[in-house]
Amino acid sequence: MNVRELIERYNGAWNAQDLDTIASLHAPDIVFHNHTADERAQGAEAVREHIAEIFKNNPDLQFSTRSLYVGDDFAACEWTARAHGVEWDGVDVFPIRDGLIARKDVYSASHRPRAPRD
C-alpha cells in the first residue's frame, strides 16, 4: 500500500469509527498530538484509548478531505470535520515509517466552530 492509499484507508476508518483498522495502521510507538487541544498520547494502546474517547464524545463525527498531499514518507491532509451540528477545518500531518503512521499531528480551528455549510 502506498502512502496515499494508507491515508485514504485511515481516513475512511476514522469516518467508520473503526478502531481496529485505525490501530492496524499505526506504528507501535505512534504519537498522536492534537496541538489545538493540547492533547498528546504516545504508544499504540494509549493512542487507541484516546481515539476511542474521541468517538465516545462525538458519535456523529465525520471528516471530508479537502486535499491530500503525499511524499515517500509523509502525508498532509486538509479536512473539514463535522460533529454536534458544527463544522471546523484542520490539517493532519503524518510522518510514515515502514508503511505505518508513526505520528499524527493535528492542527485545527476547533476553537472556532461554525454552522454547517449546506
Which residue stretches match the model-derived regions?
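A short gly/proline-enriched turn/hairpin at secondary-structure junctions
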Residues: 31-41
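Short, well-ordered alpha-helical segments enriched in acidic and aromatic residues
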Residues: 16-31
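A beta-strand edge to alpha-helix "cap/lid" segment located at domain peripheries
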Residues: 2, 33, 48-118
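Solvent-exposed, amphipathic alpha-helical segments
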Residues: 5-13
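Short beta-edge strand/loop motif at the mouth of beta-sheet-based domains
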Residues: 39-49
